[in-house]
């Protein structure tokens, strides 16, 4: 709530401290720079949720996504200063430990916030305290830049749906590397990658193969 607002917009009329050079490319603290071997992330822009419903007490918004996605949640509110809004996913307690969540402390008046620490799941929970009026909620889907290009069809609906779910599972475990799972173990594991890279040839557009080459 003490942050300088709109400093990154051309309409900003305030003043900022002078820029400081902390290091040159190829030198400390950065080290050698290398060309990124995979595409930049896919970015959907801000999107409306499939549906939004309130809890019985009216203190929580349950915002449905179209599928299990990697997203950054957004809100626009009018609030008193010092109110804490909690944001988490339905996958927050999906493993052995609680995982990714966000908090936003309000300032006085109308304001917007997007939590850039990405999280994933099927539904976003906004827990809203008294003294906060919600004006809008949205989400931004980001992820590895490839398309679900493969297809499968048979006379059994079970296997058709299994294909769709498997392709979505493959995609949700991709970002800067293949990962065990996107909600708690985001490190690359070769055991998982071996399975996933084999699926990528059948399910994804060619750009998906670059993640396996990166290793």
Regions found by a protein language model. Name each.
Residues 1-183, 191-192, 207-213:
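Extracellular/oxidizing-compartment recognition motifs
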Residues 195-206:
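Well-ordered alpha-helical scaffold segments within catalytic/enzyme domains
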